[in-house]
Structures are given as C-alpha cells and as structure tokens.
Amino acid sequence: MSIEKVRAAFAALEIADRIRELDESSATVALAAQALGCEPRRIAKTLSFQGKEQPILIVAAGDGKIDNHRFKERFGVKAKMLAAEEVPEKIGHAVGGVCPFAVNEGVEVYLDDSLRRFETVFPACGSSNSAIDTISKFTCAICSRLFRACVRSFHLA
C-alpha cells in the first residue's frame, strides 16, 4: 500500500505520527478541504505530468492553475497529464493519493511558488483518505532529503 511507503519514510524522520488518516475521502481538493476543515487553497495538490523522459510531479496550492505556455517553456514539452491508469505504475501512488513523498525512482518533483503563501499546507500521504499538515518549507526539505527528488520552486500561473 502506498500510504505504508510514506509512513515508513516518515518514520525515519520521526514524523509518521503526523499522518492523518481520515474517515472520509480526501481524493480531490474540495473533498480534502472539507475533510480537514480548511480552505481549499491550503490543500497541496500534486499533479502528474509526462516530461520528455521521466514523469513530473508539480505540487501547488489548491487554487493554483497550470499555465501551459510557462510549462512548455520550463520543461520543453506540452503539459500533458498522465492518464489515471498510468499514475500508479509511473509515480507509485494511485490518483487521489498522489503526493510528493515516497515516489518512484526518477520522478521529478517541483514545488510551485503558490505554496509559499501559507505557513502550513496539507499534501496527501499516498492514499485517498490521508494528509499531513506540514510547513511548506518542510515539505521541500523532506522531498529532497528522503526521496532524492529534484525539488525546484517556480511559479506556473
């Protein structure tokens, strides 16, 4: 199970107890905000795209939008989201639980500047009913430290 991979990785940082498993679905920004009792923009949504060679994850605020022109400028390819059936194999998490933690080798993770507006954000933790409340700067640190992700901050829209 994907959440177990995240839990094991977080155990190494002694933060596994901060994972929140919810009684209701958190598979979308709206559902996660409702389940967590926060504004939708504070949900750190993780979007899956196909890069030139490897998959790309972009973590953005719940109200963030992808600017197709800027995406192509930055990555050299048109913004094309992975099909739902491709996501588990290419990323390591199923749609609804995709997160920047414990992803497959070679997946590049990018954090959008839209996250900087908030002291804390809520990314998923590998399942469609989980989240962790985290300081946005900490999200960047655990992505780069634990999972050797290519973490960059940039503004897409």
For the regions a protein language model found, what residue spans apply to each?
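Extended, low-hydrophobicity, polar/charged segments
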Residues: M1-A157
